[in-house]
From Swiss-Prot:
Residues 140-149 have a biased composition (Acidic residues). It comes from Caenorhabditis elegans. The lineage of its organism: Eukaryota, Metazoa, Ecdysozoa, Nematoda, Chromadorea. One of its GO terms (molecular function) is guanyl-nucleotide exchange factor activity. Residues 213-223, 255-269, 361-380, 782-799 have a biased composition (Polar residues). Disulfide bonds: none annotated. Keywords: Cell membrane, Cytoplasm, Guanine-nucleotide releasing factor, Membrane. This is Exchange factor for Arf-6.
Length: 818
């Protein structure tokens, strides 16, 4: 209705050829609707000005007897000094007529007739903007946006020939907010529009107003699509578009029209809409947030405050904060190449000591222009919000892998928390490093500068070491091998036409880094990369041709757990003599299968594979599982009661299965027992809760899940300790229920089974503790070696490649040189 009334009134008045004569009796008429108050007469009397006071902020008074010079700044800027308020003389009449800018967006569309008569017959319009976005118009931007300023007084014709004495933008400090007035508009009436927005349309508590008593308030950039509520500062602006399922803040129509080159949060369609605020000077709502369009057409929010709200950027070394217990000083050496290149997230603003005005660079990505959210990162709500955003990023919901990489590279406290939650979603336990790298790069695309890429690779390395602490000794080893795999991938599958790298060259190059890896593992990794290249560009798969994000927001079906022998970590291997004693269900093995046979065993993840020799035959994935045994909740221990053979150890698997193995010496026996127990302790899922019964001494045993556990080692250790305490209570209850005069076989068998469970979990605890202690000792030894002056002198004398040779920067340069 407001638009129809405004359009009809303006079209009717646009047909008037000449200005009305001064001797005509003055009358006033208004067309009032929801958010538009249109005056059909240029001269408004004091009576209607008083009626208009209902639309003005509280405290504004209109008195016709007061001379315009005697009005206060707030009253004069409110636009209440109408021509009919003082009729004492022509000079006073001229002074009392205040020019009012009128939005000409509709008149411009009517053609030359409206352009010709817009200065004489366009009505005075005061648009009360309630929800329109707030813009910041510079004096130099008026010509670019093709806007006109129409003054509604006849005295303006006389002043058109006078040049403007001051075309610069001036700052007017008000008691409540900070208003920017452009002399090109020549309208103090816009100030009252802004004040009415703050006081009448927005109900903000007084505690949340940021008073600006200085002439240079600080401006910090917030993320797009931010809307403030009446409860204080806006909620977290970080990646609101990803969280569209919870908040509904993302318009799907605007999303589908964005170009592929721009970010999915770019308001391209929104900028095309004709809103009254496009012709205003500056309006600031109660929250103090203002929108403005930059040169690239992207819009951002500006937060006006005199307080220093500089975001506290995280440390450049992310691993020191996330995995502090897993790091060693060697990381500083491997970061030397990254520090040489310009940082992707260097601070682009320079703030003064007293909080001067500063703006971020217009070329920076909108994904990186996020401030620290109002939600505390240490609160439960902040962690919950970060976990939800991380889940959306992990599922590529309304975003691409390119945008995920930009989001993870942001440098603020809340983004750091999102990064931690995002990494926790990757479960690399029992997964070989090349398969884990493929999974990580399928969701995160390596882009940007070398420092940003290397930071993502180091974050991946830290997470892989967290999930597999028994494979590598330090973070540097994981990071070195990761960069080496990327170098190998670019050499084997890159556009270079030279000689391809061989397995011997690959092993030799890694040996120069100072890190020691098993030769068989390097051969396996080389063959895997050679047969299947690592894809480094996945953003095109996650978006449609017109740039809109593909429909990945639907709930993905739950994946069925599969074991791929070719992508699982191999912990140990060797020839063994095998004999089945009991089947997986606890029954005795048939006589024909109980003989001793030689096999080549491979311990990969939670599965023990058996082959005829060390070169497995090319079979399918499921065919290899036929000659395999699952080791979840298994226990390996020497079998001194077996007298027929020496160096024999027993493996008891879940639900009663038992297998005997014979080694060639005592050392191999201890190695096999240690590796099998570690795998079972680290990756066996916790048992399901016990059933509720009135007789706990006869209750069935809990079920043992087959799915591997993806919790860290420390969490598994605490779980096993709690299980031992629970078993002690159960053993005590069963012992009290046994009668010495009339023993019950069921209760006795249960007591034996509980005692075995206690011994199994106690063995798990000891194995995990030894593993953690060995890792700490290795880290301490590495630190001592690095801090020894003799060691430093020896390293300087050796003409070998430094340990950070295979960082990502050198890897890329090395790939280009081939």
């Amino acid at each position: 209705m407001a638009k129809v009334a405004s359009s009809g009134a303006e079209e009717a008045l646009a047909t008037i050829d000449g200005a009305p004569r001064r001797n005509v009796k003055k009358s006033e008429a208004f067309v009032m609707s929801g958010d538009v108050l249109i005056s059909l007469n240029r001269n408004v009397s004091s009576t209607y000005a008083k009626l208009l006071g209902d639309q003005l902020p509280p405290g504004t008074t209109v008195a016709s007897s007061i001379h315009p010079h005697q009005l206060s700044r707030a009253t004069a800027s409110a636009g209440v000094s109408f021509p009919s308020m003082n009729r004492n003389g022509a000079a006073a009449q001229k002074l009392s007529r205040l020019p009012v800018p009128v939005s000409t967006s509709q008149i411009e569309r009517r053609g030359s007739l409206a352009r010709k008569t817009s200065e004489e017959s366009s009505p005075t319009a005061i648009r009360m903007l309630k929800t329109a976005p707030i813009e910041r118009m510079e004096s130099t931007d008026v010509e670019e946006s093709e806007e006109e300023t129409v003054m509604m007084t006849t005295d303006e014709k006389e002043n058109q020939k006078k040049p403007n004495e001051n075309d610069d933008e001036v700052m007017v400090v008000d008691e409540e907010q900070f208003i920017v007035v452009s002399n090109d508009m020549k309208s103090p009436n816009e100030e009252i529009v802004a004040k009415s927005l703050r006081s009448a349309m927005f109900t903000m508590p007084t505690d949340n107003h940021h008073h600006s008593y200085n002439s240079s308030p600080q401006i910090s950039t917030l993320s797009p699509h931010l809307r403030s509520n009446g409860d204080g500062p806006s909620r977290s602006p970080v990646y609101d578009d990803v969280d569209d399922d919870l908040n509904g803040s993302l318009d799907a129509k605007d999303m589908s029209n964005n170009s592929h080159q721009q970010s999915f949060r770019s308001p391209e369609n929104y900028s095309e809409k004709d809103t009254p605020s496009k012709h205003s000077v500056v309006t600031i709502d109660g929250s103090g947030v203002s929108n403005h369009y930059d040169q690239d057409g992207m819009f951002s929010h500006v937060y006006y405050s005199t307080q220093d709200t500089t975001p506290k950027h995280g440390s450049p070394s992310l691993r020191k904060q996330i995995f502090e217990s897993r790091t060693t000083p060697n990381t500083a050496a491997s970061n030397s190449s990254a520090s040489a290149s310009p940082s992707l997230h260097a601070t682009s603003e320079s703030r003064g000591a007293t909080g001067g005005v500063s703006l971020r660079s217009a070329e920076s990505s909108n994904l990186n222009q996020t401030a620290v959210p109002s939600t505390s990162t240490n609160s439960v709500g902040g962690e919950r919000e970060a976990a939800q955003i991380a889940r959306n990023l992990y599922e590529l919901k309304n975003c691409t892998s390119t945008q995920v990489a930009d989001r993870l590279n942001e440098q603020n406290e809340f983004s750091f928390l999102i990064l931690v939650k995002y990494l926790e979603l990757f479960q690399f336990s029992t997964t070989r490093i090349d398969a884990a790298l493929r999974e990580f790069l399928s969701r995160v695309e390596l882009r940007g500068e070398s420092s940003a890429r290397e930071r993502l690779l180091r974050v991946f390395s830290a997470r892989y070491l967290e999930c597999n602490p028994a494979i590598f000794d330090s973070l540097d080893e994981v990071h070195t091998l990761t960069c080496a795999l990327l170098l190998l991938n670019s050499d084997l599958h890159g556009p270079n036409m030279g000689k391809k790298m061989t397995a011997r060259d690959f092993i030799t190059n890694i040996a120069h880094t100072g890190c020691t890896f098993k030769r068989e593992m390097l051969k396996t990794l080389f063959q895997s990369i050679k047969d299947n290249a690592i894809s480094l560009q996945n953003s095109a798969k996650n978006s449609t041709a017109n740039g809109s994000v593909a429909s990945t927001s639907r709930r993905q079906p739950q994946q069925i757990y599969e074991v791929d022998p070719d992508s699982v970590v191999e912990y140990y291997s060797g020839f063994l003599m095998r004999k089945y004693v009991r089947e997986t269900d606890g029954g005795k093995t048939p006589f024909g299968r109980r003989s001793w046979r030689m096999v080549y065993a491979r311990l990969r993840g939670l599965v023990l594979y058996f082959d005829t020799d060390e070169h497995p035959k090319a079979t399918s994935r499921y065919a290899s599982l036929e000659n395999a045994v699952s080791l979840h909740h298994a226990l390996a221990e020497p079998a001194p009661d077996y007298k027929k053979k020496s160096f024999v150890f027993r493996v008891r698997i879940a639900h009663g299965g038992e297998i005997l193995f014979q080694t060639s010496n005592q050392k191999e026996l201890q190695e096999w027992c240690e590796k099998i127990n570690f795998v079972a302790a680290a990756f066996s899922s916790p048992t399901l809760p016990l059933p509720v019964t009135s007789k706990p001494e006869t209750a069935p045993m809990p079920r043992l899940p087959r799915i591997p556990c993806l919790a860290p080692i420390t969490k598994q250790l605490s779980t096993h300790e709690a299980r031992v305490a629970e078993l002690n209570e159960m053993i005590e209850i069963v012992s009290q229920s046994v009668s010495p005069n009339q023993p019950q076989q069921l209760i006795t068998d249960r007591w034996v089974l509980l005692s075995f469970e206690k011994r199994r979990y106690s063995t798990y605890i000891n194995v995990l503790r030894r593993s953690l202690e060995a890792r700490k000792a290795s880290s301490a030894t590495t630190m001592n070696i690095m801090m020894t002056p003799t060691r430093r002198q020896q390293q300087n004398q050796k003409p070998v490649v430094s340990e950070d040779r295979l960082s990502y920067t050198d890897a890329v340069n090395g790939a280009a040189a081939h």
